[in-house]
Each structure stands twice: as structure tokens, then as C-alpha cells.
Amino acid sequence: MTLQIGVIGCGAIGQDHIRRLTRTLSGARVVAVNDIDPQQARDAVTKYGLDAEIYGDGHEVVAAADVQAVLVTSWGPTHEAFVLDAIAHGKPVFCEKPLAVTAEGCMRIVEAEVAHGKRLVQVGFMRPYDEGYRALKRVIDSGEIGAPLMLHCAHRNQSVGERYTTDMAITDTLIHELDVLRWLLGEDYVSTQVVYPKKTRHASSHLADPQIVLLETASGVRIDVEIFVNCQYGYDIQCEVVGEQGIAKLPDPPAVGLKHGARQSVEIMTDWKERFIASYDVELQAFIDGVRAHALTGPSAWDGYAAAVAADACVRAQKSGAVEPIAMAERPAFYRG
């Protein structure tokens, strides 16, 4: 069976997913598209040679009889309504982050999915599909380094635009760590604090950069995450897990080691899409396979809610300078195991 997908949102990430659905992945095809800019939807159909209907409203995509699953890649504040509509129609939905712009919105999606009685939602957190993170989790789960005690992490971007704001260091950047570190450790966060080192001269006047986010988990693991979005030298993701009897480190992407002119060097990527391109392929293929097997296994609506609650607390901590609690609702039995 070829899964027939409707895409809501034909901007950069939407077109990137259309590209992989059309040219890279197997078992699915795009049969419907929508964008707030009709020309952008038409351009996507032309560019990728789609045999797809263009709809003027995203909810029409959800309701279309030939659409079996929905891909939501529209503007963040529209996500909640489209996901809730997909659940109401009983259609599986892959939603790029954020699942909703508030934790309350995420909880409404959780409650709707629980009421429906079957998992329909997968959230677009791709790092759990990165082979480096998967290898790191295998080491942690094996017990080889003992119980994790501390994590030292960094999320560095070469530069960001003028529209990037201090809170986006949490909601756009740290959000990936909030998801993947919770997945790595298999436990929730209980508190957070944000501290500000000396500001880089490369940051705009309205942006605090870098930032250090401190997290504590339910078992007492301490995590520090450096967020530095104007580091200049490249795109660099680091994660080191300190255990009771050893240390495990996220591997860097493979690159040619160069010895030349009395110097030794390794190239560093500058584009986040290049760093995680394989993960995007794997996560969307997992969604296709999960829908066809009637068993979604990727990041759930509950994972989207957990990330939103933690992000809200981190934003509060940015403003207060204090240790802020991260208080989640009780996990429904629907999402356990």
C-alpha cells in the first residue's frame, strides 16, 4: 500500500519534506498540498512534478477523501488546530515542531488523542533518529559507563539573523536538547536555571548570547547546555555523558582529516540541515512505516507536551534568573511503555 499524504505548509521545511517524500523515501506519495501563499503551493507541485490537488485551506487537506495521513509544516501557531482536526478525522499526522505554541495547547492534543484511543501523532523531533545519538543511547542503556551523573552539552550556530530573540534560544534552539536529552536518559526534568556569560560582540543588541541552561532530572542528573548561536566557526553539537565508571561522548560527523602546510585540521559543518539530513530522512520514513503497520513509534504528543513544559520553564528562568520548577501533569497510561 502506498500511503497518500496531504502536506499543509509549502515553505522551506515543507518543500524539503516533499522532496524527500518524492525522491528519497519509499511507500508514500503526496496527493494534496496547501500553503497560505497559493503560489508557493503551485511552485511546489511544479518543482517536484506532483500529481496533487492544491487546496485553499489546510483543513480541506485534512478532510480530503484521498488523504490518508497529514504532514503539518505550516506556521507554528497554526499547528494545534490542524493536528486536532487530523485526530478528529482519525488520520495519522506528522507535525513539525512545535506541536503547539503553548504547553496547554499540547495538552489539548494529548487529551484528544487519548480520547480517540489510538496513537495518531508523531512530532518532528529528529535527533532520536541520528545515528550518533542512537549509539550514545545504546552505551548508556548498556550500563557500560554506570549510571549517568552529569551531561555537558553545547548547541552552537555560526550566526543568526536580526529577528532571532533571546527567548528563541529556548524555543527554537534548546528545544532539540530538551527532547533528545530526556529521551537519552529516559526521565523527566524537575528544574531549570539560565545564566548569562559575557555577551559576544557578534550578537545583536536585543539578543543575550551565549546562554547556559542548567537542568536537573527526576533522579538528580545535572545537565548544562551551552547555547551559542553566533559562534562564527560553524554548526557544532556536543553531548558528553559522565557516568559512575566512564564517559560517553556524542561522535562528531565524519570528516576528512587534513594534514597540510604544517597544520592538521578537520572541516566543521556550517549548516544544521547538512548535519542532520539523514535523521530527517529516517524520521519521516519511520512515520510512513509506522502508519502502514498501524503502530507509530516516533516522538509522541506526550513528548511534544513534555518539551513545551520544559521550554516554558526555561523561558521563565531566563527572565527571573532563579531556579524554576518544571511541573508536568501525570503521564497518561496511554503513553506508558
From Swiss-Prot:
SUPFAM superfamilies on file: Glyceraldehyde-3-phosphate dehydrogenase-like, C-terminal domain, NAD(P)-binding Rossmann-fold domains
Protein name according to UniProt: Inositol 2-dehydrogenase
Keyword set, alphabetical order: NAD, Oxidoreductase
EC number: 1.1.1.18
Known role: Involved in the oxidation of myo-inositol (MI) to 2-keto-myo-inositol (2KMI or 2-inosose).
Protein family: Belongs to the Gfo/Idh/MocA family.
Top-level enzyme category: oxidoreductase
GO biological process per UniProt: inositol catabolic process
Subunit composition and interactions: Homotetramer.
InterPro entries linked: Gfo-Idh-MocA_inositol_DH (IPR050424), Gfo/Idh/MocA-like_OxRdtase_C (IPR004104), Gfo/Idh/MocA-like_OxRdtase_N (IPR000683), MI/DCI_dehydrogenase (IPR023794), NAD(P)-bd_dom_sf (IPR036291)
Organism superkingdom: Bacteria
Pfam family, one: GFO_IDH_MocA
GO molecular function: inositol 2-dehydrogenase (NAD+) activity; nucleotide binding
Organism: Burkholderia lata (strain ATCC 17760 / DSM 23089 / LMG 22485 / NCIMB 9086 / R18194 / 383)
